[in-house]
Amino acid sequence: MRKHVGKRIAAALLAGAMAMSLVACGGKKSNNTIGADGKVDTSKHEVINMLVLGDKPSNGRCEAMLEKLNGILKEKVNAELKLTYVEWADWQTQYNVQLLSGDKSLDIITTATDWLYAWENTQKGAFLPLSEDMLKAYAPKTYEQVSSMDDWKYCKYQDQIYFIPEDHYTQYTNHGLFYRGDWAKESGIENGDIKEVEQLDTYFQWVKDNKPEVIPWDAAGKNLSGGLLGGYINSKSDNIVIPSINVGNYEFWMGVSKDDPFTVTSPYMESNVIYDASELMLKWNKSGIWREDVLNYDGDTREEMFAGTTGADEHHSMTFYSQIRPNMDRKQSGSDAKMYWWGMENNNVSKPLKTHGAAAISANSQHPERALMVYDLLRNDEACYRLINYGIEGVDYVITSDGKLDHPEGWDKSKDSLDSNFWCGRNDDLEIQDVQWWGGTKDMIDHYNTFAYDNPYTGLVVDKNSVEAEMSAMSSVLAEYIPQLAYGKYADPKAAIDEMREKLKAAGYDKVKESLQKNMDDYKKSIGK
């Protein structure tokens, strides 16, 4: 059931509170004053620029959608929306560069505490602190919904709110490898169900031997520089990733296990599992499981899988049930696409963080109040929500007689996708069930729910200031070694790992670990564990 804003705050009290909140937010001059009637003055037209992740679309569909959407935004809040894309090529670097560039044109920022450096960028001053009065006034529906779930506490740093969680949207974002069940069955794997890493070896080799026109896994190593090392560790150890404290681009720090999550470790330094993983990658490299120049390749593995020219792709569960399986059923009939998720052997799967998707307001925004008003509409207004997420009805999507989402005849995701990538405010109350999603979606989610554990690090904020130099030095070491290990480019991976460990020690590994453990101990105490 949709939630509605309760009683209106008295106009005089709200106006006074807003004056104080704006001073607290750095004294920015507001173009959105609140009148005696309690309404916001939106007489000045403003352009709101939202930073999103993904390759900028070129098919014209997003532009057409924005034209329709901006008509509504102009009518409701006298604003229009513009999208700025951080494209997938070198996105980890470019995203942070964009945020810290001082660009005054940016307003709404797509962020996350696990994969988009939300805490780091908060600490570096990239985001504007958001007072509760500000949120109540300019994003009232969002404020009420998040408050009803008591989730603002996950968005606070030094007792101030810095972003808005996408906390009312159901998804599983645990990663794994997508593969063809028909080929897996032909390779001798029972029912074509890969249930352990070793069976990937069987599958890849069969594809290599029997499908000469196919690259078993045409990995885009330039973008996925860690390859399957992290997945192997997830499946072959009890370690659990500690989100938001990556070293460079890599999920380096982990908890010992779900039963001992508050003891910090790193399998890259303290376990033999990385030796085993790198030996398998060496074998796969020698066998030609990926292309020789994999580390320089940045092609679209997913489209290759849809075209039948590669036998695997890597991403998360939601991608599987919303895109991979339905597209493979249509484009590679009988392929029986399946997913081997990391941690299948040992049920090492956590539920997503509530801040896996979130929205922040840029610290350099020239009109943060109007940005919040636009965001509130995108997240809660049905017409705006459908446009930003689905496009134009009758062109990008249609509603079936039973109220489900479908696409017009001839629509092809590869060519006609909207790609607005609004991943920071999706809302289960306004989601429309997609008829093209895999029919087994509910069963897959229900299965995860039987064993997936709550992520123990929701709300963990790590202060890296005292070890920033050491973390940077460690990042340089990992950038040198991890891609080469991940794609089997070292003739003697054990020697390379030992050398990497020596360099990480010299870079300050022990100091960083000690600092992180102190943060973890404080966090454990704060949540009463």
Where are these regions (language model features)?
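Extracytoplasmic/secretory soluble proteins
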Residues: 3-14, 18-529
